[in-house]
Amino acid sequence: MTDISPLDQARILSEALPHMQQYDEETIVIKYGGHAMGDEETAKNFARDIVLLEQTAINPVVVHGGGPQIATMLKRLGIQSEFAAGLRITDAATIEIVEMVLAGSVNKQIVGYINEAGGKAVGLSGKDANMVKASKTTRTIVDPGSNIEKAIDLGFVGDPEKVDLTLLNQLIGYELIPVLAPLATSKEGQTLNVNADTFAGAVAGALKAKRLLLLTDVPGVLDKSKKLIPQLSVKDARKLIADGTISGGMIPKVETCIYALEQGVEGVVIIDGKMQHAVLLELFTNQGTGTLIHK
């Protein structure tokens, strides 16, 4: 039984219809974060929402993270994790675990939930069919003792350089739902771990997606009084980074949004992935949810 009256159900559908028409046959890239995955019921609700998108003539492409799951496995195996510039330092032993968790465990679990909900999902990583080529990430940090910048070696961590859409376009054409683990291959054939937000931005940009949704563990971009900012232009987003309003882990997320917009994505939204049906609320309601960043 539902507590929603028939009249309210009709109003909900009436509100959703123009949004469904707006996204008809469009591609939506959804980055599903490790923290946003939540518990099993939340994950299954997410899967049902993805299937609903496909059934309403939208082309969903899911990119997932897996930071918490990787950390759990590394701890179980007694491998210490180190971070620099917000990125995991990934040595040869760690990249094997990262690939096992992302491509072998997390990816297949999401695929299973989507298929259980009636969809036809296909699990892949950026390594498959050389979909995503990347170069090793270079970062610098300031040494606190000398105040001198120095380069740091992050190991097998990469930044996307090229996305080959051949396989993705075929899957979308067959009405299959791609679920992508953020792994890529270097020109030397090495496996590289790519930040999931960055990976999703590169894929969305290559696909010229209508929307990129970044599901996170926060409601969106917050102002200095911790209130949600519903919309931001790229110009305003850069100002908020400069004045410190956008800080910490939100900076690379917003930078990913800006990059995706520059590559041709129409709009990027940072939303709270722990909220039930966050994807549907963003796409199919007038108010939406989270922070929309646009040109």
Swiss-Prot record:
EC identifiers of the protein: 2.7.2.8
Keyword Kinase belongs to the record: yes
Biological or metabolic pathway of the protein: Amino-acid biosynthesis; L-arginine biosynthesis; N(2)-acetyl-L-ornithine from L-glutamate: step 2/4
GO terms assigned for molecular function: acetylglutamate kinase activity; ATP binding
GO CC terms, sorted: cytoplasm
A biological process term (GO) from this entry: arginine biosynthetic process via ornithine
Binding-site residues for substrate, renumbered to this chain: G66, G67, R88, N193
Reaction(s) the record says it catalyses: N-acetyl-L-glutamate + ATP = N-acetyl-L-glutamyl 5-phosphate + ADP
Listed InterPro entries: AceGlu_kinase-like_sf, AcgluKinase_fam, ArgB, Asp/Glu/Uridylate_kinase, NAGK-C
Compartments in which it is found: Cytoplasm
Family annotation (Pfam families): AA_kinase
Major localization class: cytoplasm
Keywords annotated in UniProt: Amino-acid biosynthesis, Arginine biosynthesis, ATP-binding, Cytoplasm, Kinase, Nucleotide-binding, Transferase
Enzyme class: transferase
CDD domains tied to this protein: AAK_NAGK-C
Residues the record marks as site: Transition state stabilizer: K31, K253
Keyword ATP-binding appears in the UniProt entry: yes
Function: Catalyzes the ATP-dependent phosphorylation of N-acetyl-L-glutamate.
Protein family according to the UniProt entry: Belongs to the acetylglutamate kinase family. ArgB subfamily.
Official protein name in the record: Acetylglutamate kinase
Organism encoding this protein: Bradyrhizobium diazoefficiens (strain JCM 10833 / BCRC 13528 / IAM 13628 / NBRC 14792 / USDA 110)
Classification lineage: Bacteria, Pseudomonadati, Pseudomonadota, Alphaproteobacteria, Hyphomicrobiales
